[in-house]
Amino acid sequence: VVALSGGAATTTFTKVITIVDPVVLPVTFESTSINYAWNDFSGGNVTVVANPHSNAANNSTRVAKMVKNAGDPWGGSWIGLGGPIDFSANKVFRMKVFSPRVGAKVLLKVENAGNGSIAFEKEVLTTVANAWEDLAFDYRTINASNAYHNIVVIFDNGTPGDGSANFTFYMDDIRLTDAMPNSKIDLPVTFDVAGVNYTVTDFGNNQ
């Protein structure tokens, strides 16, 4: 910037301006030009970290780490997007989660940036411990005419956290898809269909 005075003298001022890209779906935490700024509340704490459990299920370089500390039972965090979410075609949220235990509740909520009462949420349970799984949140009944700008995540809503490993979760690849995963088992049983839980129940001392 060069400021001209009434005479011949000039003053030069240099300032570095950093321009960051807005957060948009899918939220992958991989971009170095996006500030993934989470807003923590009531004991929740989210940071973007190197993926500590990289494997075939999730080989991302970076993921979000949620620690639920002591606080309110609804402690969590939210992130604002650069614009309203487009639900015109896809209405099923997917999010990869690494949970320390089976049966942990995962609530994913969307809110209007100016009016928090305009919101929609779904809650699902984790089905594996100490492994990545791709959870699905059925948003097919959402009022798509409303504008939703914020994504809220709460783990174990209704239970206060304690900041321990038992309340430490990881999440990644928040995105919209067009269908719920196929969770029922159809014949023939090949054990090869993604999204199907091939749980086998033993009986008669058989293992």
Feature locations, PLM:
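Short, isolated positions in well-ordered beta-strands
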Residues: 10-11, 198
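Beta-rich carbohydrate-recognition modules and glycan-binding surfaces
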Residues: 20-207
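C-terminal edge beta-strand
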Residues: 11-20
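Bacterial/eukaryotic Sec-type N-terminal signal peptides
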Residues: 1-3, 17
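Short, solvent-exposed loop/turn segments at the edges of extracellular beta-sandwich modules
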Residues: 3-9, 160-163
